[in-house]
Amino acid sequence: MGTPHLQGFLLLFPLLLRLHGASAGSLHSPGLSECFQVNGADYRGHQNYTGPRGAGRPCLFWDQTQQHSYSSASDPQGRWGLGAHNFCRNPDGDVQPWCYVAETEEGIYWRYCDIPTCHMPGYLGCFVDSGAPPALSGPSGTSTKLTVQVCLRFCRMKGYQLAGVEAGYACFCGSESDLARGRPAPATDCDQICFGHPGQLCGGDGRLGIYEVSVGSCQGNWSAPQGVIYSPDFPDEYGPDRNCSWVLGQLGAVLELTFRLFELADSRDRLELRDVSSGNLLRAFDGAHPPPPGPLRLRTAALLLTFRSDARGHAQGFALTYRGLQDTVEGRASPEDSTESLAGDPDGANASCSPKPGAAQASIGARVFSTVTAFSVLLLLLLSLLRLLRRRSCLLAPGKGSLAMGPSRGPGRSWAVWYRRPRGVALPCPPGDSQAEGPAAGYRPLSASSQSSLRSLVSAL
């Protein structure tokens, strides 16, 4: 009877340790693009060929390109992401990431990188436009100053969901039904530079680069479980005297925000985060006080974001991802992120982002509690096992010799094990001991595996 319980205990032990290790939980970032700027200047991925999945030409290492304009030596602070690697980057603000390649017979020594994961959220892709019928069936127009945001703004004012740029100067508007019947084209087909911005691509010949008009909007109500909010006029720079607001509502007990890009001109350009129900200021960031680099969790059911720029403000702006979390171990906001504890901070400066004195102690306390709980369960299981085994007044397990039922003869020596509450004591049985001869007759010899398990258990006591 004791052996099956012992084997069950040994099988449960790794499982309990695994559960204890998982008690802290983990958070996974949303599966979004690796790029949040339209030209991929923020790409920090690991593609090192000009094509996806090893297609195209291999890139040269940035620390071996000193003969060219850009190398790791020209980026000592790592601002452009260059270093002792050969990953695609965009150090000069070109229309998309690129890399140096071994010079070809045509004298070409660099190539653009086709990176499927480097398309800013809100960009839906490159599509064929044959003109009959047009890929997007709404109104259209042309401009010699066309940028992505100029087209987005035009279609937003017309009340359409989608905006498409083509051939560097043409803009088309459409709806979701147009996209459903659209024909995707290779991403590299949309390679025409926008007439109004040298760092943006505006489709190609007979190719539409299609965007959601919500990109760079100045207001909106967001209820999707997760998504992205851009500063006004994005991917262009935000303009002066902007006063914009967005509402995130009913996404969960906790909201998690992560700033993927934050570049404001100065301290007079400011982003505020407020609880909708109370109006309390939760956080505030500006050009002099940027947000923390990691996820920011706020205990609020609905959040109001307000952005204001002064009369001179011009900068790239911001891009943030959000997602709603339930009030569980995985999504629980820390006390300093709660609405009540932040309501008294009118400035929203960086002091509100730093950990409070009790945060580390609370985290340690939680870990200690989970550890004590797990080992309490292990102790209860061990005590239950000992109670079952206590029915035997003596278990005989020989040493290196053969099993002897009774007094030891020869080099082997018998052992009598008395289990008492709450622990066991192992003592050698002297020759002729009644404990070794009497009760042993009522029990079968232990198997080799049981002897090994018992020996391990005794040594641990």
Curated annotation (Swiss-Prot):
Residues 218-325 form the CUB domain. Residues 1-24 form the signal peptide. SUPFAM superfamilies: Kringle-like, Spermadhesin, CUB domain. The keyword DNA damage does not apply. CDD domains: CUB (cd00041), KR (cd00108). One of its GO terms (biological process) is negative regulation of ossification. The chain crosses the membrane at residues 364-386. It comes from the Eukaryota. Glycans are attached at N48, N221, N243, N350. InterPro entries: CUB_dom (IPR000859), Kremen (IPR017076), Kremen_rcpt (IPR051836), Kringle (IPR000001), Kringle-like (IPR013806), Kringle_CS (IPR018056), Kringle_sf (IPR038178), Sperma_CUB_dom_sf (IPR035914). It is found in: Membrane. It is a single-pass type I membrane protein. Its main location: membrane. Residues 120-214 form the WSC domain. Residues 329-357, 429-452 are annotated as: Disordered. Coiled coil: none annotated. Residues 387-461 are cytoplasmic. One of its GO terms (cellular component) is membrane. Disruption phenotype: Animals with a double knockout of KREM1 and KREM2 exhibit enhanced Wnt signaling accompanied by ectopic postaxial forelimb digits and expanded apical ectodermal ridges. They also exhibit increased bone volume and bone formation rates. Triple knockout mice KREM1/KREM2/DKK1 exhibit enhanced growth of ectopic digits. Interacts with ERLEC1. Forms a ternary complex with DKK1 and LRP6. Binding to ERLEC1 is mediated by the oligosaccharides linked to the kringle domain. Receptor for Dickkopf proteins. Cooperates with DKK1/2 to inhibit Wnt/beta-catenin signaling by promoting the endocytosis of Wnt receptors LRP5 and LRP6. Plays a role in limb development; attenuates Wnt signaling in the developing limb to allow normal limb patterning and can also negatively regulate bone formation. This is Kremen protein 2.
